Amino acid sequence: MLDLLKQTIFTRDFIFILILLGFILVVTLLLLENRRDNIQLKQINQKVKDLIAGDYSKVLDMQGGSEITNITNNLNDLSEVIRLTQENLEQESKRLNSILFYMTDGVLATNRRGQIIMINDTAKKQLGLVKEDVLNRSILELLKIEENYELRDLITQSPELLLDSQDINGEYLNLRVRFALIRRESGFISGLVAVLHDTTEQEKEERERRLFVSNVSHELRTPLTSVKSYLEALDEGALCETVAPDFIKVSLDETNRMMRMVTDLLHLSRIDNATSHLDVELINFTAFITFILNRFDKMKGQEKEKKYELVRDYPINSIWMEIDTDKMTQVVDNILNNAIKYSPDGGKITVRMKTTEDQMILSISDHGLGIPKQDLPRIFDRFYRVDRARSRAQGGTGLGLSIAKEIIKQHKGFIWAKSEYGKGSTFTIVLPYDKDAVKEEVWEDEVED
């Protein structure tokens, strides 16, 4: 019995010790769990701070209760979503900046108070503001429209404005400005966008078109009036042998001049519409020019009204070039004819030619009337004449130099004139030249053989 009692007491004490040890273990585990939770909470808190700071690279990996695990996984997912969103925003920003940078139109944006928050380089150049800080400046001040418009006008009316501006090079520009509102999804207006389109060339072309139509009308009206007058005189009975032949001759001359003008206009139209193409061939340019000058020498013997001397001032060596011989003949003929027309009787006309590494330079000089300084920049304009009455009397259409300029441009060259009034003029043509072109062609032929 005693032994049984002792055994019972021992068992009871052992159970008590186990319970005590179990309690201590539970308390210890709870304390450890609480400490681990605190560490994990600190890690989660740090992760949130990293997200706020823009660091999305760290990934949490925690073991524990389901709630902690869920929070950790959600934070990792949120971090990845934010990272991808940030990358997309950066890519869109770069794409937008690239588009704005390469746009030929100027673009600027404002906040709701009309202050500039964005402007591209084109707009800065158009407004002459490259070196100025324009952010936060008023759009009204920037466009110089504060005297005529208020910000409310731009918002409520979104007008289209035509402005005169001066770019960074001091060139005057015509700008067409269009406005658009920046709206949020709620409809709240948060600012304006203005697009500046340079219409300088368009306005210039429109002015030239109007002037061209006016000139064509005038140039055709003058000979038509003459022809009409003479035909009316003939119709009314002026058919006697002493008068009628002169009337008919003048009518034919004016008709021929109109035909030449129409032909020149059609030629220019084909060039403008890019339907006039060069038929190039490889020729000896020295022989080509010499042939033209020989033709003019033969004409000189038949010319009764005007005597002139053609001087060749160039070496007789081969200059091989690819040109359209018909069109280039038209250019040289026109310049030589003008030199003869405006030179005094017995005048000297000098033709010079030389080459550089990559250019052929042809110049034709005369000692004629010359061109006034104020007229020199416009002599290649269509229908422009220094002396309209004299040019018309000599049968000119006023289009010869315009056509010459366009033909030279088709050959990727350029033409200009220097002149001193009363002393003469020099017309210079520069064409691209490759001195090795013939060597290469001969070498290719030898290889093919």
Swiss-Prot record:
Its main location: membrane. SMART domains: HATPase_c (SM00387), HisKA (SM00388), PAS (SM00091). Residues 1-13 are extracellular. It comes from the Bacteria. Residues 157-211 form the PAC domain. The modification Phosphohistidine is found at residue 218. GO terms for molecular function: hydrolase activity; phosphorelay response regulator activity; phosphorelay sensor kinase activity; protein kinase activator activity; protein kinase binding. Changing residue 222 to A: Greatly reduces phosphatase activity. Increases transcription of the peptidoglycan hydrolase pcsB gene; simultaneous deletion of serine/threonine kinase stkP has no effect. It is a single-pass type III membrane protein. Its EC number is 2.7.13.3, 3.9.1.-. Residues 92-158 form the PAS domain. GO terms for cellular component: membrane. Residues 35-449 are cytoplasmic. It catalyses: ATP + protein L-histidine = ADP + protein N-phospho-L-histidine. GO terms for biological process: osmosensory signaling via phosphorelay pathway; regulation of DNA-templated transcription; signal transduction. The chain crosses the membrane at residues 14-34. Autophosphorylated. The keyword Flavoprotein does not apply. Disruption phenotype: Almost abolishes transcription of the peptidoglycan hydrolase pcsB gene; similar phenotype with simultaneous deletion of serine/threonine-protein kinase stkP. Simultaneous deletion of response regulator pnpR increases transcription of pcsB; similar phenotype when combined with simultaneous deletion of stkP. The keyword Nucleotidyltransferase does not apply. May form homodimers. May interact with serine/threonine-protein kinase StkP; the interaction may play a role in regulating Walk signal transduction. This is Sensor histidine protein kinase/phosphatase WalK. It comes from Streptococcus pneumoniae (strain ATCC BAA-255 / R6). The gene is walK.
